[in-house]
Amino acid sequence: MANDKGSNWDSGLGCSYLLTEAECESDKENEEPGAGVELSVESDRYDSQDEDFVDNASVFQGNHLEVFQALEKKAGEEQILNLKRKVLGSSQNSSGSEASETPVKRRKSGAKRRLFAENEANRVLTPLQVQGEGEGRQELNEEQAISHLHLQLVKSKNATVFKLGLFKSLFLCSFHDITRLFKNDKTTNQQWVLAVFGLAEVFFEASFELLKKQCSFLQMQKRSHEGGTCAVYLICFNTAKSRETVRNLMANTLNVREECLMLQPAKIRGLSAALFWFKSSLSPATLKHGALPEWIRAQTTLNESLQTEKFDFGTMVQWAYDHKYAEESKIAYEYALAAGSDSNARAFLATNSQAKHVKDCATMVRHYLRAETQALSMPAYIKARCKLATGEGSWKSILTFFNYQNIELITFINALKLWLKGIPKKNCLAFIGPPNTGKSMLCNSLIHFLGGSVLSFANHKSHFWLASLADTRAALVDDATHACWRYFDTYLRNALDGYPVSIDRKHKAAVQIKAPPLLVTSNIDVQAEDRYLYLHSRVQTFRFEQPCTDESGEQPFNITDADWKSFFVRLWGRLDLIDEEEDSEEDGDSMRTFTCSARNTNAVD
């Protein structure tokens, strides 16, 4: 065959083919280097075709690793170049490598910029353009300044100090001079001061329209110089917001990072802060929405600024007496709230002795109220309490409750008439019965209407647990046990009678008063206990046997102050209060207005 390959050997020679086909080391040494490589490669290729299971041919990888490293290096250089353009905004980088790499793309982008120069969206989306003449150069400079400011904020060791310094250099005023300090981001406030650094002009103008819907007053101004740009906002929201909420709102609205914001509540007490905002509002570069807040007008108006506010303690006492505030915490809180409309309250907040004034005011009000209460007769006092009750009520709810307990209302009215007069041996009413029969509900509603006090037997080991009897017209001891009744039988027989008793008061001398009418609720029937024999004549009992809770555990009866008001008005004559009421009206005591402040009505200036 013409294409027959391989060696020709004679089969009669036996194993002599081994000598013919074998490779010798001496042959390789005599061969040329290039020829040896070619022969070995060719031999390996031929051998690999005949391999059956194990491939011992040599493998050549080529330069794949070098190509991979070259591609990685090129991709890394492109990423670094893009990062420099985004962070630094360098015109040299954008006009250097990028212009040399894609000149056609640059020319197209520049042509698009010239065709659509009036479109604001293109200016925002493509801020980095080749510097040209006019508007394009100015826009590029602004973007470069913003990027440079962001870079300074990132590189600065103390970003807060850098922002405070930039704010003071632009507005010639410290940021802390116009703001207060809130340490908790959850504290809510309506008036906030915001400083934004590196804000683009398009977002500054758009934020004015977006924030007007959420604010009752909005004032904003933006300034810039070679160090960067800063915009300051005074925002009075319609509802109180926390710093965290305002920060998220403004960061999304202005499209800036939270690191570029400084946010604190407005300083409403300070002439310098008010003048700063008032002067800024007069500038034509300031955008303003709504009327100036009251705290700015009050401190910048000529009359208010020249007027010297002096605190008058008597005016404060008169205010607390008119509102019936006798607790120190209530007086302090409510009078601080009145500072917006009361000049004396503002002067009170400016004093350094607020705690002393509040304590003295509460003491004086308690003295006045106690003397006023003791000066009134029981009919006049009940009439005054009826004026304080609001709403519409019906005396029939009380009638229905007594009928439900199988008690005649006329019996309760006769006992109540003697109880209100404080007649001896009729000065204590006890409501006896099993639990959940409405005893405490009835007595607590009556004591609340009369403005009485509640005594807790848990404090009986204290010498002063009866001190509140000196300042009240009626008292209640709820859920009296055997220990309480034994205490009454041992120490308070004259108090149950309604005779004068001596009351020990803390840090004061003991006072002698007539024991006020007393209500007692208990599960123990005193009349059936022989051990309380001496209390039988001193206590008038009413037994409640019917439970006052339905299947769901709720109480169907609810007696309010308006119901007691209707009850007393309806049964005023039957309670024998007419004569004393007419006498008080003729004397004019009930119509007299009490004045505890030094009002100089006839003074001559």
Curated annotation (Swiss-Prot):
PROSITE patterns: SF3_HELICASE_1. GO terms for molecular function: ATP binding; ATP hydrolysis activity; DNA binding; DNA helicase activity. Signal peptide: none annotated. The keyword Transcription does not apply. Phosphorylated. Probably phosphorylated by host PKA and PKC at Ser-109. Phosphorylated by host CDK1 at Thr-102. It catalyses: Couples ATP hydrolysis with the unwinding of duplex DNA by translocating in the 3'-5' direction; ATP + H2O = ADP + phosphate + H(+). It is found in: Host nucleus. Residues 407-557 form the SF3 helicase domain. ATP binds at G433, P434, P435, N436, T437, G438, K439, S440. A motif (Nuclear localization signal) lies at residues 84-86, 105-108. It holds the Pfam family PPV_E1_C. Keywords: ATP-binding, DNA replication, DNA-binding, Early protein, Helicase, Host nucleus, Hydrolase, Isomerase, Isopeptide bond, Nucleotide-binding, Phosphoprotein, Ubl conjugation. GO terms for cellular component: host cell nucleus. It comes from the Viruses. Its EC number is 5.6.2.4. The modification Phosphothreonine is found at T102. GO terms for biological process: DNA replication. There is a cross-link at K514 (Glycyl lysine isopeptide (Lys-Gly) (interchain with G-Cter in SUMO)). Residues 90-112, 582-605 are annotated as: Disordered. The modification Phosphoserine is found at S90, S94, S109. Residues 592-605 have a biased composition (Polar residues). Residues 142-308 are annotated as: DNA-binding region. Belongs to the papillomaviridae E1 protein family. ATP-dependent DNA 3'-5' helicase required for initiation of viral DNA replication. It forms a complex with the viral E2 protein. The E1-E2 complex binds to the replication origin which contains binding sites for both proteins. During the initial step, a dimer of E1 interacts with a dimer of protein E2 leading to a complex that binds the viral origin of replication with high specificity. Then, a second dimer of E1 displaces the E2 dimer in an ATP-dependent manner to form the E1 tetramer. Can form hexamers. Interacts with E2 protein; this interaction increases E1 DNA binding specificity. Interacts with host DNA polymerase subunit POLA2. Interacts with host single stranded DNA-binding protein RPA1. Interacts with host TOP1; this interaction stimulates the enzymatic activity of TOP1. This is Replication protein E1. The gene is E1.
